[in-house]
Amino acid sequence: MNFNIIIKIICENIQLAPIINMVSYKELFNINDTDLIVPSDTLSEAVYDNSKLDYIFQNVNRRNRDEVEDESINIQTQLPKQQNQQISKDMSEVGSKQVSEIRPDSDSRWKLLRVMAGAHQGWVRSCTVDPVTNKWFVTGSSDSTIKIWDLASSNLKATITGHIMGVRSLAVSSRYPYLFSGSEDKTVKCWDLERTNSSSGCQIRNYHGHVGGIYAMALHPELDLLFTGGRDSVIRVWDLRSRTEIMVLSGHRSDITSIASQIGDPQIITSSMDATIRLWDIRKATTQLALTHHSKSIRSMAMHPQEMTMCSGDTSGNLKEWLLPGGELLNEFGHSGENKIINTLSINPSNNTLFSGYDDGRMEFYDYVSGDLLQSDATTPVTGSTESAIYASTFDMSGLRLITCEGDKSIKIWGEE
């Protein structure tokens, strides 16, 4: 399939820029049309019986922690060996090394590589990187649009419209050519990135049920389940096959700010503005454990991609590292005080660096193992703007680039010296 040709007739919801080179998931994974998500009456009936999700779980090959880590390494070694010249000239040469072999020096510093000024017409509130090829990333904005960008060149690949309010959360499937978005308009939408010849457009599904804005979402890494949460303080679990809401997880007393999903237990972890983190047993639809160590609202939480650990940050500048599945507190660091609101956290597994982005534009890089502060910096608003907040961030899959989404309507790309 020549994707460069069929993308020219992309659905009416997407406006394309001239440069198009998006991955074909059907080719990459050898997926046939019959393999795509379709309603399953058997599954729908099963999730509503007394056993809840037992039907799903009994069909999943459970893997131990070592196998999960091996899979993450295999994904990394499939990434391109030669980095794009536009990025490489600003960074140390990586030559033909495998991405998994790259271990930057501990004394290296992150510096600004590129400013995508005017990337959106409003605050840039969410971002995520393509988990399959590491070639593109997606951003959502308070201007209600979603944009897809080439990671190497930062060229705009597509603009997706359909939400009527700001886009606060995004998730890209690693199993299907689907993008999910959550908005302040209380809707979750599913976009088919390869449905280019459909007269109905690329928006293929709506998930209705939330009564407030949707601020967080996550896809289960193995099961066809989507988790969403937001202002209504509950987490809704959606069956992607039957398109139905299969359960509601209640317990938080304020906005849901982050959701993380993993293969092992606890399969769902959430953070909230009520200053708690909850670990959920989704087989029983109950809270397995509530962590109450934070004294202020938690705006961000990040899970280590290769370890059973996670980190959370609150509005007083405190960072806490946790061990899973038991929720033991491993470390506390950060700088507590006023005006130290942490909006976003990201973990770079290639060198165990934790990035913390603040509401006042400050940026901090920590050694994830020791909690030592490695670098403290600040972003500079683009000309004509006084907004400096960093709202969202993510490392690419190689760990060589950091993407920050900011209040000055820009996107910034950072790399190590």
From Swiss-Prot:
CDD domains: WD40 (cd00200). InterPro entries: G-protein_beta_WD-40_rep, Prp46/PLRG1-like, WD40/YVTN_repeat-like_dom_sf, WD40_repeat_CS, WD40_repeat_dom_sf, WD40_rpt. Pfam families: WD40 (PF00400). The keyword Nucleus applies. It comes from the Eukaryota. GO terms for biological process: mRNA cis splicing, via spliceosome. Belongs to the WD repeat PRL1/PRL2 family. Involved in pre-mRNA splicing and required for cell cycle progression at G2/M. PANTHER family: PLEIOTROPIC REGULATOR 1 (PTHR19923:SF0), WD40 REPEAT PROTEINPRL1/PRL2-RELATED (PTHR19923). This is Pre-mRNA-splicing factor PRP46. It comes from Debaryomyces hansenii (strain ATCC 36239 / CBS 767 / BCRC 21394 / JCM 1990 / NBRC 0083 / IGC 2968). The gene is PRP46.
